[in-house]
Amino acid sequence: MLDKLEKILAYDNVFLSGGAGVGKSFLTNELIKSYRKQKKLAIALGSSALSAFNIGGVTLHSFFCLGYCDDMMKLSALDRNQKQKEKLTKLKELLKTIELIIIDEISMVSASVFEMIGFRLKNSQFNGKILVVGDFFQLPPVIKEKKETLFNHSYYAFSSFFWQDLNFKNIKLSQPKRTQNMEFYNYLSLIRQGFLDEKILSFFESLRIDYKELENLEDDYTLLCGINKKVNNINQEKLSKLETPLVCFKAQVKKEDKRIKDEELDSWVGSLNILEELNIKIGARIIFCVNNWDKNYYNGDQGIIEDILYEEEKIYISIIKNNGMKILLEPYTFFMEELEQSGKDFVVNILASVTQFPIKLAYAITIHKSQGMSIEKLVCDIDHIFENGQLYVALSRATNPNTLKIYSTKKINFGFYFANILKIDSNVIEFYKKHNFL
């Protein structure tokens, strides 16, 4: 598939899509490695700090000098600033050297932001290719204010004028990597598109448990739910039952560049899937929140804290993963970066950093924070499903239907409620229907 993708990118822009757990991120990372091996300049951009980290890149807001702007009017005002003009001059020079721009998690990029990206690229006369990666059936862009815009009918990137200009070749991955159970995968694929019948309903209803069964589940199950407050309460309650001493690790935040505003730094730290204050105990069940291939832990991996070690000036957390592997975890440093041209290459400037252990308590997690994770033993609390694609994202974290449970306190008919919370944006359905995928 990598060869095919590279051949298409030689001539066309590409939209790489597919459901959850089909290997989009893996293929993207392989492509980046291949380009770098060939000494081709490819830049990986994420819609958030976490997605940027996962593909070894920077955020698209940082790279394209978008600041906090969410529409062209605000961007035009920002661009009149002298410091901004200097940044844009550097960006223009950098774009002349880049052969491929990759934008990950495109479903989280709004039409307005994508239009601003188009504005930047057109002004810079960018001649390279663009690869956008993601699944519009998953979580949509976060829109702070539902205000009147040019894209009022739909907030997705595919509704922007720039999307049409790019004339993408569409590729869809469809071979499951997360689960080996084809019946489960096929049912997930159908509800992803909003299709529901009695057979599918019966399958998911058979996974339902009541409160007593929930309480009797082993602690190695992770509960996914829609609201932060419930997640925090569950994790706090489970942690308080452990009799070992409480240990708190505070994230170490450093501003390396004085140009970075405090609110910009706070926003960046908040978008990472780490805790500014991590409270743990020996014996606590944790989940890893990032991929670190070199150290053998991955986003969604779980384990139990065996010990907390203080050696000279270093601190380690000894964790036994569910598969029995022992990890001696060190704090991880995330960098806020910007790219700058240096001759025919580019250099990375560090603007800020935050250092923290990349774990959280695993008893409960919000659905939004679980995107991209594979979870072996999973309970989906479906009481507070409110967003398009949210139910599908929650259920598709599971690797095995035999260790997937569905919990709800709703007294109404399960089938009626399940159908009601299976929210799919009609614009997304229409988009996939009218486009051909290779």
What would you call each of these model-derived segments?
Residues 1-438:
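Conserved ATP-binding/catalytic motifs of P-loop helicase motor domains
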